Amino acid sequence: SSDVCSSDLVTYDYIKSCFLKTGHNCPTKYKMPTLKEALAVCKDRIVVNIDQGYQYYDLVMAITEELGVTEQILIKGKKSVDFVDAQAKKYKHAMMYMPIIDINKPSGQDLFRQYMDKKIIPLAYEVCWQQETSEVKKCMKDILAQGSKIWVNTLWASLCGGEEAGMYDDYAFEHGAEVYQKVLDLGTSIIQTDRPELLISYLKKIGRHN
């Protein structure tokens, strides 16, 4: 269930006693894993995005270093270039880092400008926008010219152009996977989705997925 109780009532031991449910609300035999347990399963297999995790950077690093999976971990954030650099230098190994650029907002525009001015090329940028503006188009163009990649999150409309743009997952589910072509036409090469089967089937259809 997605319902959350008071933290005073839901203890770690209580969470460990619960069983996960399917999308149809049927209980399974599986329980909630800790981050350490989940990463142990993922070791040497996949890249793991620790979503909303930058504020827990040191805690995450302690776990990943113990397991030897640090270089498999992707973490994203909105901190300044200098802050991120100083944080990474504290450790022998580094997680992959990706800036999140809210390009419709002054703070996001400022962060993007830092990367451009310092000529820093991250592995990719997650670009978020609520409405189409000249800043959005220029941002996408500059990223590709720099030689980096564009990551677009299609989970919600507010992350990829708003309702009118029609680029988000539920819109694609209701109107057809061709919706994702609009995302690809921006130069996007990484799409974060809650509809992987729908997206992958479309990518295979157009020859963009092996």
Question: Where in this protein do the model-derived segments appear?
Answer:
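Short, small-residue-biased leader/transition segments that mark boundaries at the very start
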Residues: 1-6
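Structured helix-beta-strand junction loops
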Residues: 10, 18, 44-45, 70, ...
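Extracytoplasmic/secreted proteins, especially bacterial periplasmic and envelope-associated proteins
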Residues: 10, 14, 33-37, 55, ...
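Long, acidic (Asp/Glu-rich), low-complexity accessory segments flanking structured domains
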Residues: 10-13, 18-30
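C-terminal active-site rim and adjoining tail of enzyme catalytic domains
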Residues: 25-28, 106-210
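Catalytic beta/alpha-barrel core
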Residues: 27-30, 47-55, 68-135, 148
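A structural motif corresponding to the C-terminal end of an alpha-helix
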Residues: 37-48, 182-189
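Surface-exposed amphipathic alpha-helices with a cationic face
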Residues: 39, 43, 61-68, 84-92, ...
